[in-house]
Amino acid sequence: MIPTRREIVKYYKTITLKDGRKCILRNGEEKDGQAALANFILTHEQTDYLLSYPDENTMTAEQEGRFLQEKTDSDNGVELLAEIDGVVAGLAGFDAVGGREKIRHRADFGLSVDRQYWNLGIGTALMYACIECARAAGYEQIELSVVAENEPAIAMYEKAGFVEFGRNPRGFKSRFTGYQELVYMRKEL
């Protein structure tokens, strides 16, 4: 039987990036609202592979801060920041797929990294941190969807043990490129 209450997961880790810089991975907090929102908007401007467009965001910095604090205090999900020299370089998190008993074992995961920090290992580190947190919270499976053209992300997920379980050829309808195929992936924890 799946527990009705999960563990609240706190995360803090310092890693060394491929270029030698230090990066802190940690739970977002209310004070991070402005920086996290700026990163969210920036990363969503930099690629067409994410779920939303920057102009669809309706959160203020204060609301983003409250969202981050709620996640930090939640037993259903986590929102992590990757911070380099006080700058938010990336965000990643997971949430329960749903609250019903039959799906309570599943978590839905996503991440984004500022393009200037790509290929330094931040995305990989955030992914593994979320896997670790999801496992610690009591989830048994973590899931994601990724645009099929995003081959580097798919390779990263496969290397971590995610397996494809389906595709939706019209999963996204991009303003720029039309329909984008989504690949659905999962990893047992």
Regions flagged by a language model, labelled:
Residues 123, 127, 149-153, 170-176:
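Short glycine/proline-centered loop/turn elements that form peptide/ligand docking sites
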Residues 143-146, 158, 163-180:
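Conserved catalytic-core motifs of GNAT/GCN5-like acyltransferases
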Residues 23-36:
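A short beta-loop-alpha structural element at the N-terminal edge
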Residues 57-105, 110-116, 128, 188:
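Acetyl-CoA-dependent GNAT
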Residues 38-55:
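Helix-loop element at the rim of GNAT/NAT acetyltransferase active sites that forms part
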Residues 2-19, 168, 175-189:
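Terminal substrate-recognition subdomain of acyl/acetyltransferases
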Residues 127, 134-145:
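Conserved GNAT acetyl-CoA-binding A-motif
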